[in-house]
């Protein structure tokens, strides 16, 4: 699966484009990085790719997954996963039930669903935490659980919005490795926005600076 941006730009109503038009190809398992100052439109770009662009903004150009233009599709049809800087888990669900929320619809049997979640928890280093209250997890554990929930939905591409910015240095390094390894192993194209050059270096993919690149 390849993610392609072809002359993509976002313009507010009555205004000028937030950033120069972007053309970029992200290969399977590759993490491309978008950098730039606050307010330039990094998160708005991700909203546009995911199909969540706010009213009052216009998208130009095209967004393609495996050569198919997904720009006209609603968010649920795009199957683009999102990972945010705040690892949001539903407080009324256990850790395991949070992950089960992300399972693809074709997986219906209770035993099959439970096994898939337990396997995901194991890969995330969260064995035995199925019934745990998510409020008791550490920041790193919450982030890993949130990523596994996203991956259980089998996204065709992944968007990362400052996913490591609220973690301390040690946790940040660990979660970077965990996240990028899963992206590469599953051959998912990913696009990350960040302020941190260390994130871009660890991603080891194309880098777009919205202040200069098009």
Model-flagged regions — what are they?
Residues 111-129, 180-181:
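Conserved ABC ATPase "signature" region
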Residues 147:
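Hydrophobic anchor residue at the start of the ABC signature
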